[in-house]
Amino acid sequence: MDEFQRNENKHRSWQQFFLYPLFFREDLYAIAHDHHLDRSGSSEPTEILVSHFFSFLTVKRSIRRIRKQNNSISLLRNCDRNQFSECKKNXCSKSLLEGLTVVLEVSFAMRSKHFIEGMDGWNSIRSIHCIFPLMEDKLTHSNYISDIRVPYSIHPEILVRIFRRWIRDTPSLHLLRSILHEWQNSFSRDNLQKAIITPRENTRFSLFLWNSYVHECESFLVPLVKRFFNSQSLLYGSFPDRTHFDKKMKHIVILXXRQISTKKIWLLKDSFMHYVRYGERSLIALKGTHLEVKKWRYHLFHFWQYYFHLWFQPYRIRSLELSKTYSSFLGYFLHVKMRPLVVRAKMLDNLFITDLITNELKLIAPIRSILFFLAKEKFCDISGWPISKLSWTSLSDDDILDRFDRIWINLFHYYSGSMNQDGLYHIKYILLLSCAKTLACKHKTTIRVVREQLGSELFTKSFSKEREFISSSFSKNRLKRERIWNSEISQINPLANFWQNMQNKQIEN
């Protein structure tokens, strides 16, 4: 595959027009099967690791069978003389699909690279811990937020149309169409969303379908938003006395309402947007009037349907005003609160008093939902009283302590930037007492005896890491004023993910 990535500009058209012969290269399936493939970009492994249930002879026979037959769907159906619902679990069909995905990923990488180079300042690949500082810096300058859930229950022909925009090889498109239709027919209607495209699927082919679909969505969504708001705004800069500037403009409108229309006043508002996505959830932070946001939602709703030929459920896009309502994202409640400030400026002998309004982003951890999850997992009862974890009594003491320790470490690191830290320490008390009760139940003794025997060993690791995390850079007084975002966050917390799924179900109902 190194040969495919050399001289991108020279071979780009070759990759787009002649992908079909690459599907019959046996070495590509060997690369797809190698679990120790170098992820830095080298596509030729030094050693091909073949397990006992995989045979390259089977791959060659399947390829020869495809060459002789006109129906390319036999790639999936006749792998082991079984139906595809049984064959999809076989290593043969799995490796064949991964081999096809390797070929498609090469052309997709070329297209996405040129697309990103054509968009100024656009970076679609960032870690999750960059999202929280971004929200803290940018959401305070926005007054509306659009919560979008990317629809993924789509027809296979929509995916074929997406591939047709950057793959012009007709045999390859026919092969993909056959695979996607057979994939759809092999699952029931209820499991269709989990089988074809979803960010939670672990198979390489499903991830490729999801990434291609999301890339296509973002390729038209982000430029559309920028053109929409840039065409309606006239930036006038950041004035120190901006509040009085707006008041004066409103005063002019009142005095000369017949001469100055409200549309001209809207042009003095600086509208801008910020886009962030994690999984199927996307947030677009907007600054503008209510009418602008309403028009934006209307155009997005209809443009998405006409562009993808897909019915967009109304509940999948919501426009919320940050200062009046709470929005949920990544396990946090988002809310913008206005803080009035009185600034006194002294110039020579005159004293001026200016009213300034600043916005503060409030990120709140859902403590009640975390308590509900702990009660569901038998760490406490419904009222929040700690109980023993009976299913862990068969483990050793070190394993029990490590498991409780990891739960608290993950919670503390993920919600380190929340404003309700007192609620987190209440969760900490519940886990601490539940751990002590679990050890007491295992040794058939009381909590007092467990505390006397272990002493400070209860949650020793979490306490030490917490103190190092806090005292290394910040003092206690500074912690009350500023947030700390932990850079070790690599994915959404399971508790936050559970709560976010509950919020999504409430929105759908």
UniProtKB/Swiss-Prot annotation:
GO terms for cellular component: chloroplast. InterPro entries: Domain_X (IPR024937), Maturase_MatK (IPR002866), Maturase_MatK_N (IPR024942). The keyword Coiled coil does not apply. Keywords: Chloroplast, mRNA processing, Plastid, RNA-binding, tRNA processing. GO terms for molecular function: RNA binding. Signal peptide: none annotated. It is found in: Plastid, Chloroplast. Pfam families: Intron_maturas2, MatK_N. GO terms for biological process: mRNA processing; RNA splicing; tRNA processing. The keyword Transit peptide does not apply. Belongs to the intron maturase 2 family. MatK subfamily. HAMAP family: MatK. Usually encoded in the trnK tRNA gene intron. Probably assists in splicing its own and other chloroplast group II introns. This is Maturase K. It comes from Metasequoia glyptostroboides. The gene is matK.
